[in-house]
Design a protein with these regions (language model features):
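Domain-level signature for soluble enzymes in the chorismate/prephenate branch of the shikimate pathway
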Residues: 2-319
Length: 319
């Protein structure tokens, strides 16, 4: 018996109190094991982080899977399902700790975000600064708000929202503007479908108020690349949005748990209509949270996820 645990006279205890005391002793032992576990995971993170090529390092992150459980005898066999679930929770926790420790080793590396999102599309000189959108009074106000963020912003007009997306997709314009939400309908699924169809990334959003303040519309500024306009602004007043394919539905609960572990606040979730590619779109508030470890976690356990945007929420000019 561990000499650090004092002997107790259980003769005066009720059965419930004895069980509670035994559980408390197990918790204390678990704390010691937990410290050892974290130390080992930090050592593993240090080993992983030794690679020189950051992109190769991130692409080879280990995906920890539960090993096959050995046959259980006696009473334990009756709890196989419960033990299996408990082990999966332990596996998830270890992965979250590992990614947090790995970020501590990598955070001083240059271009960490670029390594996490390596598929950067080159912007042609004639497209740089061009913002395309379908004209309306609301969209004009959104353009003025977004143009204040961009040097040499120039407006270009499209005959439809799909045409605006296509201009960016084909490299003719650097940015486009789409309405993505309003106070009446909530999220506008038709525009979420356009964003997915053309693989565009949200880099800023702005709420445009109408004559009736209750009828505001949220517009998004989008581009082909995932990198935000400003890391600092996005971290202070930003969101992270991504999608998981239908076949990854079982991962949603794990992802929500990890987001909470890293201090990200859940904002919304939706799915595209069944007739389209089935996707779970998830949005988190990243202010005050640890986004980078969460990105490492997603790269490890859900490499099939699709980033939709790391973006800041800007105010309409004059409001």
């Amino acid at each position: 018996m561990n000499e650090n645990f004092e002997m107790r006279d259980f003769g005066t205890y009720s059965p419930e109190e004895i069980i509670a005391e035994n559980l408390q002793e197990l918790f204390e032992r678990a704390d010691v094991l937990g410290e050892e576990e974290i130390a080992h995971l930090c050592e593993l993170a240090a080993e992983i982080a030794q690679g020189d090529d950051l992109a190769d390092l991130l692409s080879s992150l280990p995906y920890y899977r539960i090993s096959e459980m050995k046959p259980l005898a006696g009473a334990l066999a009756d709890h196989r399902e419960l033990l299996s679930r408990s082990r999966k929770l332990l596996e998830a926790r270890q992965c979250m700790i590992l990614c947090r420790a790995l970020y501590e080793k990598l955070k001083h590396r240059e271009n960490l975000l670029s390594a996490l999102f390596p598929d950067v599309e080159e912007v042609l000189p004639q497209a740089a600064g061009r913002i395309v959108y379908q004209r309306s009074s609301y969209a004009n106000d959104a353009y003025l708000a977004f143009a204040s963020l961009l040097p040499n912003a120039r407006a270009t007009y499209a005959h439809s929202f799909a045409a605006a997306c296509e201009e960016v997709y084909n490299g003719h314009c650097e940015y486009c503007i789409l309405p993505v939400e309003n106070a009446v309908e909530g999220e506008l699924i038709g525009f979420a479908k356009l964003i997915a169809q053309f693989d565009l990334k949200i880099i800023a959003v702005c709420d445009i108020a109408g004559a009736d303040a209750s009828r505001s519309t949220r517009f998004a500024l989008l581009q082909r690349n995932m990198l935000p306009l400003s890391d600092a602004d996005a971290m202070k007043n930003g969101c992270f949005r991504f999608s998981l394919p239908k076949e990854s539905a079982s991962l949603v609960a794990d992802v929500l748990t990890a987001a909470n572990f890293y201090g990200l606040e859940f904002r919304s979730a939706n799915t595209l209509p069944p007739s389209e590619q089935s996707l779970f779109n998830l949005t988190f508030d990243i202010c005050g949270g640890d986004l980078y470890p969460f990105l490492l976690y997603l790269a490890t356990v859900a490499p099939q996820y699709t980033p939709i945007g790391i973006y800041s929420h800007i105010k309409q000019k004059g409001i």
